[in-house]
């Protein structure tokens, strides 16, 4: 049975275009990109994406947010409900976690980053607001569910 997230009847965001999750980033690490593409295929079968959300994979080690801080992943939540959101994930530091952990654990950290930002996406869809409350737990549950369906990320 597919455990699809049920959205509220009245969403804050406007699904004015085709929904879905799109992965962009040909310059990212091949291992990371392939793992995120496989994870995204599974996500599309298990969850709903009523507003299109592109995921940009950056070849840099870290990203600079709108506020000037650095992060490994970000979610852009537009102020208007009819503007498309997006997620950015830095993949340039794949060699660093790969040196200290095995391949699966290193890739799982990127999948967790994507799941974390997707929880923010669903918060934005529902309410237009974003909070960190419960996000880590929900993201971990998403990655754990995916881990039950695959041998390696």
Please state what every model-predicted region is.
Residues 1-22, 26-31:
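Pan-zinc metallopeptidase signature
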Residues 57-64:
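Acidic helix-start/capping segments at beta-turn-to-alpha-helix junctions
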Residues 65-107, 121:
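Active-site scaffold of zinc-dependent metalloenzymes
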Residues 112-125:
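Active-site recognition of the HExxH zinc-binding catalytic motif
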């Amino acid at each position: 049975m597919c455990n699809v997230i049920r959205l509220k009847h009245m969403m804050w965001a406007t699904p004015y275009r085709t929904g879905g999750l799109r992965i962009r980033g040909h310059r990212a690490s091949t291992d990371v990109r392939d793992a995120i593409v496989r994870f995204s295929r599974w996500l599309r079968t298990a969850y709903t994406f009523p507003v299109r959300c592109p995921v940009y994979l950056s070849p840099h080690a870290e990203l600079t947010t709108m506020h000037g801080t650095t992060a490994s992943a970000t979610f852009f939540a537009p102020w208007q409900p009819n503007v498309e959101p997006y997620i950015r994930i830095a993949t340039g530091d794949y060699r660093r976690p790969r040196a200290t952990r095995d391949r699966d654990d290193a890739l799982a950290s990127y999948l967790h980053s994507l799941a974390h930002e997707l929880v923010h996406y669903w918060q934005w869809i529902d309410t237009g607001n974003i909070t960190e409350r419960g996000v880590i737990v929900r993201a971990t549950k998403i990655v754990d569910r995916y881990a039950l369906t695959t041998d390696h990320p």
